[in-house]
Design a protein with these regions (language model features):
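PLP-dependent amino-acid enzyme catalytic core
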Residues: 1-359
């Protein structure tokens, strides 16, 4: 399913904004939004899967804090593509589905108390086996192009490139995808020749991108294991807890923010919860903590006078509608096939995961 962009009335009136456009990634039949995974990761999952060569015999590996796992599981199950998900044990409640998945989808987890980075580390151990391959993350053009559909949806609906782009980020790949889509639209020539200002937001206290940007640094500050796991446990938006985002390398988030005169901001759990409540009251549907962080950041900037009330603003609601799609339904949860300690030996991991797909 595709993102749906519409001009806000309720939220826009509340904030005093003349041109607020919401790009909705999720489930809301009232606006014909049909992403049953309730996440914008659904757009990237199908584009990544569509790019896998025919005859590929290896198993796709995806590390996730939750929403990517749900989206890839849905896509790979429907396409019968062998998939191994690596997720922190404390995030498995995100792996709900409206129907059982194909047995080609398997889940392994890192022990309780671990975070997204630990899931990535586990995936790296799996990839020592020649029977598995990595989906590629931010470096996979299919992933960026999939997420870039949100920006394309907004621009083609509005009829012009927006002035501002708001999104909460963990890796920042979605914002990079928006920047790349923006550049292509400039080349197209029908929607303007300017770059939307990227305003990315993080959920405090887990905010390595914010800290690096505010320090004027291209490098993400060191985040030791203890404090990273502690902060990841504190924040509501678990999907934003990436310790090592693709920020520094050429063409990454730092370059995207620089090129667009962008900014990085933060929102607390309390601010995000208020924003989520406001969105449901004014726009009529629930949103996840991550887009609530983005909305909270927009509210802060509007209230501080940092944004012209006449500006054309795109708010990327990256996940929404779980309450609607799960109401009065018996859900099916993907259960872990194996729990690994943080110190699991590479050979043990490889042996275990190979057995999962040979049984």
């Amino acid at each position: 399913a595709a993102p749906v962009t519409y001009r806000s009335v309720g939220l826009a009136t509340y904030l005093g904004l003349q041109n607020l456009y919401i790009t909705f990634n999720g489930y809301n039949p009232m606006i014909d939004a049909r992403m049953t995974s309730c996440s914008f990761k659904e757009a990237e999952a199908y584009s990544v899967c569509g790019r896998i060569p025919q005859g590929e015999s290896r198993v796709l590996v995806v590390a996730s804090a939750g929403n990517s796992a749900r989206a890839f599981a849905k896509g790979c199950s429907s396409g019968r593509i062998p998939l191994l998900l690596c997720v922190p044990a404390d995030n498995v409640e995100a792996l709900w589905f409206d129907k059982p998945l194909s047995s080609c989808v398997k889940l392994i987890v890192t022990e309780s108390g671990s975070d997204y980075f630990d899931a990535i580390s586990l995936a790296e151990k799996v990839l020592h086996s020649r029977h598995f391959f990595d989906e590629g993350g931010a470096k996979n053009v299919a992933r960026r192009d999939g997420m870039g559909t949100s920006f394309l949806s907004a621009t083609t609906t509005i009829g012009r490139i927006p002035d501002y782009y708001f999104q909460a980020v963990g890796s920042g790949t979605g914002a990079v995808a928006a920047w790349e889509a923006n550049l292509r639209l400039i080349e197209d020539g029908r929607y303007g020749n300017h770059k939307a200002r990227l305003i990315v937001s993080q959920n405090a206290p887990f905010a390595p991108i914010y800290e690096a940007w505010q320090a004027g640094s291209r490098d993400i500050p060191h985040y030791d294991d203890y404090h990273a796991r502690r902060d990841a446990a504190i924040i509501d938006a678990k999907v934003l807890s990436n310790r090592r985002p693709p920020y520094s390398f050429a063409g990454g988030l730092y370059d995207a923010l620089k090129a667009t005169n962008g900014d990085a901001v933060v929102a607390t759990n309390a601010q995000a919860r208020r924003a989520a409540k406001l969105f449901k009251e004014l726009e009529g549907v629930d949103i996840y903590p991550a887009p609530a962080v983005a909305l909270a950041s927009l509210i802060k900037m509007v209230e501080s006078g940092a944004i012209d009330k006449d500006a054309c603003i795109m708010l990327n609601i990256t996940g929404s509608g779980e309450e609607s799609i799960t109401a009065n339904k018996d859900l099916w949860y993907l259960k872990p096939s194996k729990v690994f300690s943080l110190t699991a030996d590479i050979d043990d991991v490889v042996c275990s995961v190979e057995e999962l797909f040979t049984k």
